[in-house]
């Protein structure tokens, strides 16, 4: 639950800024998503009974909304959903795989959620270098380590001093710190 609570925050915050939401609307929406997710996961399992990985989708929604935040325009607003396919490819889901199995990947339609709610150019600006890119690099490096260090693999040896899972935790902590520093660069336009 904590990972989902963390990862929905950035894209929802971006929607708040581009949709001109009040803080109370933002928090209400955030807690409705968290509580709904918690209950659905409790009763229906990790894919919520509908084949939806909210954590994975939220990574895509964050990048989509971040690109839209940076390059907002009325036209790009509706094109921004296509960024989600690039994110999917980075995380190992090919466009061919998605298009050949739309029943499983039905959730790609949610790539356009940021476009629906991002009705205005953000009133804030952010500095992306170096913190955003360092955060992305450390997160993607952590993801690659995660793919190698799971049980019954060569790199997952419980008696070793070097544990990929522990390195993954350190790398994701570093990425979280970088993203914190990135959000601290926000300024009024």
Which positions does each model-derived feature cover?
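Multi-pass alpha-helical transmembrane bundles in non-GPCR membrane proteins
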Residues: 1-189
């Amino acid at each position: 639950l904590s990972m989902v609570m963390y990862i929905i925050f950035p894209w929802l915050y971006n929607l708040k800024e581009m949709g001109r939401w009040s803080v109370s609307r933002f928090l209400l929406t955030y807690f409705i998503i968290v509580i709904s997710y918690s209950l659905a996961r409790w009763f229906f399992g990790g894919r919520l009974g509908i084949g939806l990985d909210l954590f994975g989708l939220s990574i895509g929604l964050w990048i989509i909304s971040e690109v839209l935040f940076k390059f907002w325009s009325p036209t790009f607003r509706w094109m921004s959903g296509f960024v989600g396919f690039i994110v999917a490819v980075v995380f190992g889901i090919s466009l061919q795989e998605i298009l050949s199995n739309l029943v499983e990947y039905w959730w790609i339609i949610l790539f356009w959620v940021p476009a629906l709610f991002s009705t205005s150019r953000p009133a804030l600006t952010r500095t992306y270098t170096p913190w955003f890119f360092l955060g992305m690099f450390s997160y993607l490096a952590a993801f690659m380590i995660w793919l190698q260090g799971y049980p019954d693999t060569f790199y997952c040896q419980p008696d070793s001093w070097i544990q990929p899972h522990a390195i993954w935790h350190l790398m994701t902590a570093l990425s979280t710190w970088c993203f914190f520093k990135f959000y601290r660069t926000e300024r009024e336009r």
